[in-house]
Swiss-Prot record:
GO terms for biological process: lipid A biosynthetic process. GO terms for cellular component: cytosol; membrane. Belongs to the acyl carrier protein (ACP) family. Keywords: Cytoplasm, Fatty acid biosynthesis, Fatty acid metabolism, Lipid biosynthesis, Lipid metabolism, Phosphopantetheine, Phosphoprotein. Signal peptide: none annotated. PROSITE patterns: CARRIER (PS50075), PHOSPHOPANTETHEINE (PS00012). This is Acyl carrier protein. Residues 2-77 form the Carrier domain. Pathway: Lipid metabolism; fatty acid biosynthesis. It is found in: Cytoplasm. InterPro entries: ACP, ACP-like_sf, PP-bd_ACP, Ppantetheine_attach_site. The lineage of its organism: Bacteria, Bacillati, Bacillota, Bacilli, Bacillales. Carrier of the growing fatty acid chain in fatty acid biosynthesis. It comes from Brevibacillus brevis (strain 47 / JCM 6285 / NBRC 100599). Its main location: cytoplasm.
Amino acid sequence: MADTLERVKKIIVDRLGVDESKITLEASFKEDLGADSLDVVELVMELEDEFDLEISDEDAEKITSVGEVVKYIESHK
């Protein structure tokens, strides 16, 4: 899980330009990290590429925090 979190953090830092220290498992993409809906869509696409998986639109709408995306990736490897 630590490796997954580190890879997710790197993508978030690259995409959103936020300080890595703000990225915690509890951090909300929109409220805590300042992402808008387009940012979230782009994050999902990058995560799909990075982890070689497909996140359905329905699932993507439910993923609102860093911890949720890490859990999703871990359970779909």
